[in-house]
Amino acid sequence: MPYPGPHSPANNGTAAASFINAWRHHWPEYLIEATGLGVFMIVAGLCVVLLEHPASSLSQAIPSPDLRRAVIGIAMGSTAVASIYSPWGRQSGAHLNPAVTLTFLRLGKVTPADALFYALAQFTGGAAGTLLMAAVLGDLFTLPPISAVATLPGRPGELVAFGAEVAIAFILMSMVLAANASARLMRWTGVCAGLLVAIYIAFEAPLSGMSLNPARSVASALPSGVWRGIWIYLTAPPIGMLLAAELHLWLGGKTSCAKLNHFTKRRCIFHCDFAGAPAMEVSP
């Protein structure tokens, strides 16, 4: 029996029952989301320490901050691509971002229970990644200039940072939704997302720190204690992505699945339009 949707008889009971049911049967996807963002933050921390800490020989070997930022962008873009196309990423959908999950909730592809647990997992996993880095590297990671890879508004100020975050989130989600309508296009979503991440880090980071992700920014703020401008990173990415969703709906666009890369050999817990997606089995 497939996992019951929000309007099925199995979910006509209490809201609490639907949340318990989701947790019982979808916890592997939640664990994947937590692990995915945790790994992403660890890779980000290692890259930034190696390339930006003054004591690093690699940082000294690349004196240009623009070039160092480009190298970090390539590394993090590649990490995003690897996450999306990994077996685990193909199962959970590789959201790794509460703003992405919220957008697919708005589009009717994710249930409220799954959206809540995805977001909790993403915040928890991101924090676990940075706290682990803090435990291993100590002040090298948590103090300036690294500050646990905190996202901070650039010299133009917080309003510019807010606008930049809305813009990059809007562009990224517009690309995802444009590719989402067919399996043929969706297979390239990960490559395009990774390319955008690399470009954003290389060119947009001086404006806002390039967050795109509320969980990612909170994860950095926890061990560093740097919370300046956190309101930007909690609000701008969801606003940008939700605006992209509204435009997508207004244009009559189709949303096939909440996965960034649908793969029919992996089960799909979402409201999925692709034929052959393995359904979640649910016990009575």
Q: Residue locations for each model-derived region?
A:
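Membrane-interface helix-loop junctions and terminal tails of multi-pass membrane proteins
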Residues: 1-284
